[in-house]
């Protein structure tokens, strides 16, 4: 999937590589979330990368190590993915809340998990 996203978006450099990896990861996570009946396809990852790239330019984001990077990805996720996921009818949540959970898993929980040891 990452190679498809890179091909379709032209994402390059450190920022492009990181955006592509994160966009593919969060898009895949929409397919595994228990409240989601149908998650997003690779087109969601393409759109997330494109939106995030444009936002990075508008916000003068310097690279993936910029402190504003995680929030930039969340904003891109909301724009690109909120209309692409379909929740289970019994779920008492919103697409935006589901995307926030996925974002927190990727940007808050994963970086702080201890390495296996």
Predicted regions and their residues:
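C-terminal regulatory/interaction module of P-loop NTP-utilizing enzymes
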Residues: 1-117
